[in-house]
Amino acid sequence: MYIKGVNLGGWLVLEKWMTSSLFEGTEAEDEYYLPRQLSREAYESRIKTHRSEYITERDFATIKSMGFNSVRIPVPYFIFGDCEPFIGCVKELDKAFAWADKYGLSILIDLHTVPGSQNGFDNGGISGICSWSQNPEYVA
């Protein structure tokens, strides 16, 4: 089977170049600093709205109608919500699996971030540092 897929970047892992409106009114350059520059209420509201509107069931239907058979979903290390101040997103991933099943699409889950960042870019969760491999707690 050939995989013909679409990347759903910017949905569950924020990347400022894709989702700049989420960062408006802050100096944050990445997902690490965004919740630290907003009130908890403002952060939760932005994330909740973004996750419910950025990718929807309609997108999965459209992806299938265009002849694709797979989606790639980047997820953060805090997907289960156990790493304050971040908000987990396992419910959204569960929805994605239901939609994919409904439209006959496969899913490739991409663990896209790790604590301390694996690459030092915004798509690693925090810009300017790359300390994941240097902290035994992060690697264990």
Language-model region placement:
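N-terminal carbohydrate-binding accessory modules
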Residues: M1-F68
